[in-house]
Swiss-Prot record:
This is GTP cyclohydrolase 1. InterPro entries: GTP-CH-I_C/QueF, GTP-CH-I_N, GTP_CycHdrlase_I, GTP_CycHdrlase_I_CS, GTP_CycHdrlase_I_dom. It comes from Pectobacterium carotovorum subsp. carotovorum (strain PC1). Pathway: Cofactor biosynthesis; 7,8-dihydroneopterin triphosphate biosynthesis; 7,8-dihydroneopterin triphosphate from GTP: step 1/1. The keyword Nucleotide-binding applies. Zn(2+) binds at residues 109, 112, 180. It is an enzyme of class 3 (hydrolase).
Length: 220
């Protein structure tokens, strides 16, 4: 991980220490090799489904899927893609809650590889540093771009922000629709799943917790 940013390494190590890192076998192959091998295996899967890859509509599908997996929907498996983060000195001594609501996210269920579609609310109480608001969105997006379970995703975002901001006072809530429930199995088109992860004052102070939960309910 020597070529990765300091922030990426810090977050990865913090997740490993807490048993919250996404299960990985080891070092990733280079990007082009991953695409090539995924395309080869996807070709075999499509052949097993008796799809005719000589058809012009299907011919490039294995390559498209490989590119989508590596460059887009699973790009968060590679810490080389971790967003560039700058923590700004808290010169204004902000000590009240900073909340960003309605952060859209699209992830992939690791059990069936179908879509998770939702929104996140993220809050923190600054200590020595503050973070650009768009970076909160980017961190949510980074961890969403992996095969995921919603509970782990929520905690990964929490620990990443705690690590970067140097404070436990972080809270994350995600409300999402799982297409493994909506599009298959029970085929429930209306249910949604909410997960919440609280740290520091958000867990120990009832008033702080309630202020955050009111913000969550506001966007719902």
């Amino acid at each position: 991980m020597s070529s990765l940013s300091k922030e990426a390494v810090m977050v990865h190590e913090a997740l490993l220490a807490r048993g919250l890192e996404t299960p990985l076998r080891g070092a990733l192959l280079d990007r082009d090799t991953r695409k090539q091998r995924i395309a080869e295996h996807m070709t075999e899967i499509m052949n097993l489904l008796s799809l005719d890859l000589s058809d012009d509509s299907l011919a490039e599908t294995p390559t498209r899927i490989a590119k989508m997996y590596v460059d887009e929907i699973f790009s968060g498996l590679d810490y080389a893609n971790f967003p560039k983060i700058t923590i700004i000195e808290n010169k204004m001594k902000v000590d009240e809650m900073v909340t960003v609501r309605d952060i859209t996210l699209t992830s992939t269920c690791e059990h069936h590889f179908v879509t998770i579609d939702g929104k996140a609310t993220v809050a923190y109480i600054p200590k020595d540093g503050v973070i650009g608001l768009s970076k909160l969105n980017r961190i949510v997006q980074f961890f969403s771009q992996r095969p995921q379970v919603q509970e782990r995703l929520t905690q990964q975002i929490l620990v990443a922000l705690q690590t970067l901001l140097g404070t436990n006072n972080v809270a994350v809530s995600i409300d999402a629709v799982h297409y493994c429930v909506k599009a298959r199995g029970i085929r429930d088109a209306t249910s949604a799943t909410t997960t919440t992860s609280l740290g520091g004052l958000f867990k120990s102070s009832q008033n702080t917790r309630q202020e955050f939960l009111r913000a969550v309910r506001h966007h719902n």
